[in-house]
Amino acid sequence: MLNTLIVGASGYAGAELVSYVNRHPHMTITALTVSAQSNDAGKLISDLHPQLKGIVDLPLQPMSDVRDFSADVDVVFLATAHEVSHDLAPQFLQAGCVVFDLSGAFRVNDRAFYEKYYGFTHQYPELLEQAVYGLAEWNVDKLNTANLIAVPGCYPTAAQLSLKPLIDGGLLDLTQWPVINATSGVSGAGRKAAISNSFCEVSLQPYGVFTHRHQPEIAVHLGAEVIFTPHLGNFPRGILETITCRLKAGVTHAQVADVLQKAYGDKPLVRLYDKGVPALKNVVGLPFCDIGFAVQGEHLIVVATEDNLLKGAAAQAVQCANIRFGFAETQSLI
């Protein structure tokens, strides 16, 4: 059994991790922690997230010193803010743990990226070099031996799963940048209260136009520029992305379908649509990314859906852990 610590367990993604790890036959939860200053310290996880009542009734322990929790721990999931993960990950690695970080702290190997988009100076360039980007379907070989896994962002997961096989397959005319219009539920903004996320305020609105940190994350890992516009929708969870691309002259519907099938035909957590395009309701609460597309002449529209808290966060983290330790990829997920 892998002794597993979940840091930042009080949040939405943290609670999903608790659920997955609790039912994993090869993992056991050693502790659930929050920051020492958290108002949730000392509360039961099941009081904050009642869906866990009678299933996981562990307390949220305040953590001020990593050494109090790292002994005999094999796996650490960090469901923490970017700056917090930046500080904690090196300490857990030093203690011999394998770290799965759900924040953006180690996703891009460029210190200037963090100053520009995250507002802090990255102190661990050697870990940026070592970190493996956890886009699970595409990085299996590297994940097998990784000790620091940077779980991709929610928007970048759906965008890259949609575009990577098309770009790598040489089907797109990249002189016209792919345009990604993405809408996420309010849970993507986290559990902390904010006026902009309150019931009476939330509507349907773009945000972070030309400035969102997920745009460079997508572009860096695709090796191609994109235009990315996120939107906040008036629903709790899930992401739908509509991606408009130009195909190279002569590329057919059948070629697009073939490239996607070759990429994901044996990938259990990506579901391809033979006809039509996916709806959000079919992935909420599930660990899948659903992908469908339509072609008209040289124009291609790809639609991808996922649960932002699952395939966009907790489920992909556990999927990466399954790959890292040689378990079935879908263990505890489906």
Curated annotation (Swiss-Prot):
Pfam families: Semialdhyde_dh, Semialdhyde_dhC_1. Pathway: Amino-acid biosynthesis; L-arginine biosynthesis; N(2)-acetyl-L-ornithine from L-glutamate: step 3/4. One of its GO terms (molecular function) is N-acetyl-gamma-glutamyl-phosphate reductase activity. Its EC number is 1.2.1.38. It comes from the Bacteria. It is found in: Cytoplasm. Keywords: Amino-acid biosynthesis, Arginine biosynthesis, Cytoplasm, NADP, Oxidoreductase. It is an enzyme of class 1 (oxidoreductase). InterPro entries: AGPR_AS (IPR023013), AGPR_type-1 (IPR000706), NAD(P)-bd_dom_sf (IPR036291), NAGSA_dehydrogenase (IPR050085), Semialdehyde_DH_NAD-bd (IPR000534). GO terms for biological process: L-arginine biosynthetic process. GO terms for cellular component: cytoplasm. The active site is at 154. Signal peptide: none annotated. It catalyses: N-acetyl-L-glutamate 5-semialdehyde + phosphate + NADP(+) = N-acetyl-L-glutamyl 5-phosphate + NADPH + H(+). CDD domains: AGPR_1_C, AGPR_1_N. Its main location: cytoplasm. Catalyzes the NADPH-dependent reduction of N-acetyl-5-glutamyl phosphate to yield N-acetyl-L-glutamate 5-semialdehyde. Belongs to the NAGSA dehydrogenase family. Type 1 subfamily. This is N-acetyl-gamma-glutamyl-phosphate reductase. The lineage of its organism: Bacteria, Pseudomonadati, Pseudomonadota, Gammaproteobacteria, Enterobacterales. The gene is argC.
